[in-house]
Amino acid sequence: MVKSIDIRQLSEAISVEKDNGTKVNYFLYPEFEIHQNVLPANTIQDWHKHQAIEEIIVPTKGNVTIQVLEDNAVRTYTANCGEVLRVKQSIHRIIGDDKEETEFIVFRFVPTGNDQSDKIKNDKVDCEKLVAEILKEK
């Protein structure tokens, strides 16, 4: 078994088809969760919120429209393919395109409140020379 890479097959996902036809494949990890969504055309999710998590939504087919209740008013935002939408702890719902299904990936995590941006930006270590040395020895 490979220790450095963890590839999850679709057969390992928790797959759910909701009453409104939305298909979701959940991949749960100890520190985060990723799920793939297929939202049928003309589908509107129920209003909901999360108690502790935040979500990052990445559209992969079509546009993702989200409505958020802010200051006692409904505000509408749209993220196109290639854009990233961060949903903080808010009352929200996702609205599908009126003509075609929408696909998107959701990354869920529990924010710690700690700024990790420097660690994230500077975490990469160049290993070209190390790998060349290791492979040269064989």
Language-model features, listed with the residues they occupy:
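Short glycine/proline-enriched turns and hinge-like loops at secondary-structure junctions
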Residues: K49-Q51, D71, D97-E100
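Histidine-centered metal-chelating micro-motifs
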Residues: I44-D46, T65, E83-I94
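Short acidic-glycine-tyrosine-enriched beta hairpin
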Residues: D71-Q89
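Ligand-binding loop in jelly-roll beta-barrel domains
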Residues: Q89-S117
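A short, N-terminal "cap"/entry segment at the start of jelly-roll beta-barrel domains
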Residues: M1-Q36, D46, T76-Y77, C81, ...
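Short, conserved beta-strand element in jelly-roll/cupin
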Residues: L39, Q51-T65
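Intrinsic-disorder/low-complexity, polar/charged segments enriched in Ser/Thr/Lys/Arg/Asp/Glu/Gln
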Residues: F32-I34, I44, E54, N63, ...
